[in-house]
Amino acid sequence: MSEKHLKNELRRQALAVRDAMSAEERIEASLQVDAIGASEIAVEPGMIVSGFWPIRSEVDIRPLMFSLREKGARLCLPAVVDRTKIVFRELVRGVPMVDTGFGTAGPGPDAQILDPDLMLVPLAAFDRAGHRIGYGAGHYDRAIARLHEKGIEPHLIGVAFDVQEVERVPNQGHDVALAAILTERGLRAMPETGDE
């Protein structure tokens, strides 16, 4: 089986397990993610943190994002601007949310574009080395590469439910390993990146 086919199969399996969680299990786990993340993720006042508006059966990190705002973070959310590019628009209290592509919501096109210092990254599956499988469009890989081209090295924390862990994610040259994974069981530093 090719790496692409293996990734697709791992994505399908991990999403099926995540989808099988009851709504109550997802809510409880999401609240635990907030409690752990709010306590363990270091945020300096003014630090730019990108989050994501949950789609489908994803972890709901909105409580965590607002906890990080209370610690002084400036928040932003991804917006799909075309088939290959996402930008991060500032999330300001009281601003209306609009459809931002890929089934997500966020600030409209008039919002300020920010470069995140810390990225809370959605994923379909992850392994203990910090490799992730996204949803297949490559938006985050390209966004991270663009930040690197600007000399910005955002701290990358994958956020998922513990059931989304797989034994091994095939790693391709363009894939960027995560510094840590946050699940309802804790914030785990990933050994391959040496961060945290």
Question: Residue ranges of each PLM-predicted region?
Answer:
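Surface-exposed, charge/polar-rich loops and edge strands
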Residues: 2-5, 16-20, 106, 110-119, ...
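N-terminal active-site beta-alpha-beta segment that forms phosphate/nucleotide-binding
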Residues: 2-116
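Short glycine-rich anion-binding loops that position phosphate/pyrophosphate groups of nucleotides
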Residues: 54-57, 124-128
